[in-house]
């Protein structure tokens, strides 16, 4: 596994020690817990982004397929069945035109030529898939960092237990 992350997530260092005082050990334990909390927060954020992209990518793909269908049928008319409600469908005769309207979100809809729409949707799909791949890499990296910090915590905690046993004797 690489020791660095291309998106700036700091790597966790494996903590090497020979002897620590109880105060030093407690200080390290606090730092480790803080680092674990930061990594978990980043992980939660990345998981949300992955979920969002998992929702968006099929929609973009479906819209792109529709635009490509319109491009193939340009100038022809065809019948479509569309959903009005959960239990109500309707049929319509549609003539494929040179322009399409794409819903961009935030109450914005723009008119594009079929070629422009196809290029835009292809670019958006590629971008979303690359972002999803990067997010999955980040998740793997973050989970490895959390594991490293948990191992550090366990080692220092076990050392403090050993110190307590020695002081009781």
Curated annotation (Swiss-Prot):
Cellular component (GO) terms are: cytoplasm; cytosol; nucleus; prefoldin complex
* Family annotation (CDD domains): Prefoldin_3
InterPro entries hit by this protein: PFD3, Prefoldin, Prefoldin_subunit_alpha
A Gene Ontology molecular function term of the record: tubulin binding
Under the heading Gene3D superfamilies, the entry gives: 1.10.287.370
Give disulfide pairs as residue numbers: none
Signal sequence region:
none
Q: Which Pfam families match?
A: Prefoldin (PF02996)
User: Mind listing the UniProt keywords for this protein, alphabetically?
Assistant: Chaperone
Report which superkingdom the organism of origin falls in: Eukaryota
Q: What's one GO BP annotation on this UniProt entry?
A: microtubule-based process
Query: Assembly and partners?
Result: Heterohexamer of two PFD-alpha type and four PFD-beta type subunits.
Q: What is known about what this protein does? A: Binds specifically to cytosolic chaperonin (c-CPN) and transfers target proteins to it. Binds to nascent polypeptide chain and promotes folding in an environment in which there are many competing pathways for nonnative proteins.
Query: What does the similarity note say?
Result: Belongs to the prefoldin subunit alpha family.
What is the protein name for this chain? Answer: Probable prefoldin subunit 3
């Amino acid at each position: 596994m690489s020791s660095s992350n291309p998106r700036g997530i700091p790597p966790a260092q494996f903590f090497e020690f020979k002897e620590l005082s109880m105060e030093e050990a407690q200080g390290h334990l606090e730092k480790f817990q803080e680092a674990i909390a930061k990594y978990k927060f980043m992980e939660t954020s990345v998981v949300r982004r992955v979920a969002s992209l998992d929702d968006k990518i099929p929609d973009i793909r479906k819209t792109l397929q529709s635009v490509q269908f319109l491009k193939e049928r340009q100038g022809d008319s065809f019948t479509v069945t569309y959903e009005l409600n959960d239990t109500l469908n309707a049929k319509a005769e549609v003539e494929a035109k040179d322009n399409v309207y794409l819903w961009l979100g935030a109450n914005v809809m723009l008119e594009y030529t079929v070629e422009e729409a196809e290029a835009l949707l292809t670019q958006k799909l590629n971008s979303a898939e690359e972002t999803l791949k990067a997010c999955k890499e980040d998740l793997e990296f973050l989970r490895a960092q959390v594991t490293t910090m948990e191992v550090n915590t366990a080692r220092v905690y076990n050392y403090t237990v050993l110190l307590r046993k020695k002081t009781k004797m």
